[in-house]
């Protein structure tokens, strides 16, 4: 945004997010190691590019033994790590229809200092979470439904 004569550049989407979305789409369309349309990057190469940039280099064992059957689990794990603190997780879980993970309690860490140093204790931060199947989809605004007789509200809303 612009403030007086100074420009502030703020990234709306990072290259890692683009590459992980690309890897997910390529995997669903062609598998993890095919690029039949000639886009220049397979799904597995997109993930490797992120891992290389992060400093894992050529000896990275993260993708060892990966197959088309378990590749998406690796993409999900990489998104969780690479995009942590960027508020993608909730929407990723909804897109993947993995809402059951949203029902699990949130676990935090209580850190206390004592004579021998720091002591870490796992604590439950929130256990009353509720996620129903209808929550995978947003409700359609009532105004939109009233304007068209062909549009119906998403189930559950």
Per-range role (PLM):
Residues 1-157:
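Acidic/polar-rich alpha-helix caps and helix-coil junctions
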């Amino acid at each position: 945004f612009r403030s007086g004569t100074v420009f502030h550049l703020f990234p709306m989407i990072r290259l890692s997010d683009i590459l992980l979305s690309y890897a997910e789409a390529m995997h669903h369309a062609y598998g993890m190691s095919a690029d039949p349309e000639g886009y220049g990057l397979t799904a597995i190469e997109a993930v490797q590019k992120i891992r290389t940039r992060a400093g894992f280099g050529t000896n990275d064992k993260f993708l060892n033994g990966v197959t088309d059957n378990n590749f998406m689990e690796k993409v999900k794990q990489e998104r969780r790590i690479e995009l942590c603190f960027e508020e993608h997780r909730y929407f990723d879980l909804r897109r993947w229809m993995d809402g059951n993970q949203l029902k699990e309690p949130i676990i935090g860490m209580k850190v206390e200092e004592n004579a021998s140093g720091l002591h870490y204790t796992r604590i439950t931060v929130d256990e009353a979470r509720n996620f129903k199947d209808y929550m995978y989809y947003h409700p359609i605004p009532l105004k939109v439904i009233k304007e068209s007789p062909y549009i119906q509200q998403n189930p559950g809303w």
